[in-house]
């Protein structure tokens, strides 16, 4: 028997955090800990730049992204740092199959996600500002000016919709600890 998804996205986990907070590392570690029969899925992000080795995303050209957006292929989409990001509508099918689904979202677009999935659980990955600066510098993707902008943005508050459940997971220690916490949250969604 396949459970039907609550239309409100009750098994959706909206992961967010500053650039460099370690979201991609946590998702990679979480995937490695999943049991073969465990219905927890991590959605791919579609992005208009090369995702590199550290990010699990599918690269699209601006034109391809625009075509997919026009066809309604994205459940969620947003622009940030001059790039386009999207989460495919396949997550709706996964939710309807009874899976807990984790998406790598954006703090600035939590309201959009909550509007479509009002029962989602938002999870913010937090990290010490000094450690965040070191991580951003170490990955070599941003200029010094871009790093400064991202550090400033990391400390800015973001709007959290009323009645949106927001959890915070610290990624200051070993990332395996934070990944285990995130996996516990996903497993809790399956049990609810």
UniProtKB/Swiss-Prot annotation:
Descriptive protein name? Ribose 1,5-bisphosphate phosphokinase PhnN
The EC number(s) given in the record are 2.7.4.23
> Quick one: a GO biological-process term for this protein?
organic phosphonate metabolic process
| Keyword ATP-binding found | yes
UniProt function note: Catalyzes the phosphorylation of ribose 1,5-bisphosphate to 5-phospho-D-ribosyl alpha-1-diphosphate (PRPP).
Q: What is the lineage of its organism?
A: Bacteria, Pseudomonadati, Pseudomonadota, Betaproteobacteria, Burkholderiales
Per the record, what are the reactions this protein catalyses?
Answer: alpha-D-ribose 1,5-bisphosphate + ATP = 5-phospho-alpha-D-ribose 1-diphosphate + ADP
Classification via Pfam families: AAA_18
Pathway the protein acts in? Metabolic intermediate biosynthesis; 5-phospho-alpha-D-ribose 1-diphosphate biosynthesis; 5-phospho-alpha-D-ribose 1-diphosphate from D-ribose 5-phosphate (route II): step 3/3
SS bond partners: none
**Annotated source species:** Achromobacter xylosoxidans (strain A8)
Its gene name is: phnN
Q: Kindly give the SUPFAM superfamilies that the UniProt entry links to this protein.
A: P-loop containing nucleoside triphosphate hydrolases
NCBIfam families, sorted: phosphon_PhnN, PRK10078.1
Q: Which HAMAP family match?
A: PhnN
UniProt keyword list: ATP-binding, Nucleotide-binding, Transferase
Its family remark reads:
Belongs to the ribose 1,5-bisphosphokinase family.
Query: What GO annotations for molecular function exist for this entry?
Result: ATP binding; ribose 1,5-bisphosphate phosphokinase activity
Q: Which InterPro entries match?
A: GK/Ca_channel_bsu (IPR008145), P-loop_NTPase (IPR027417), PhnN (IPR012699)
